[in-house]
Curated annotation (Swiss-Prot):
Gene from which this protein is expressed: rps19
Keywords tagged on the record: Plastid, Ribonucleoprotein, Ribosomal protein, RNA-binding, rRNA-binding
Pfam families attached to this UniProt entry: Ribosomal_S19
Record's protein name: Small ribosomal subunit protein uS19c
Natural source organism: Epifagus virginiana (Beechdrops)
One Gene Ontology CC term in the entry: plastid
Cysteine disulfide links: none
Chief localization: plastid
PROSITE patterns with a match to the protein in the record: RIBOSOMAL_S19 (PS00323)
Biological process according to GO: ribosomal small subunit assembly; translation
Family the entry assigns: Belongs to the universal ribosomal protein uS19 family.
Single GO term (MF): structural constituent of ribosome
Length: 94
């Protein structure tokens, strides 16, 4: 289901990613697709596939659903892991 605002824009999908998904759809197979393309837009042919998206350190697998259509792949993978402030750091206090 594509929402109307996304139809007005030209959607960017990396060519290698689109080719891999088309090949898997033709074979009717489900495999994990590894990609570094966080800027690619999710399109309806991706629904039901597992795409492993790079977060800068590792690839995190994401299952694509119909609610994700129109969003970018990078929106669903966090790049920063906040570990909290240091508890016993008295040097920064006065």
């Amino acid at each position: 289901m594509i929402h109307s605002p996304t139809l007005k824009k030209n959607l960017f999908v990396a060519n290698h990613l689109r080719a891999k998904i088309n090949k898997l759809n033709n074979k009717k197979k489900k495999e994990i697709i590894v990609t570094w393309s966080r800027a690619s837009t999710i399109i309806p042919i991706m629904i039901g596939h597992m795409i492993s998206i790079h977060n800068g350190k590792e690839h995190l697998p994401i299952y694509i659903t119909d609610h994700m259509v129109g969003h970018k792949l990078g929106e669903f993978v966090p790049t920063l892991n906040f570990r909290g402030h240091a508890k016993s750091d008295n040097r920064s206090r006065r």
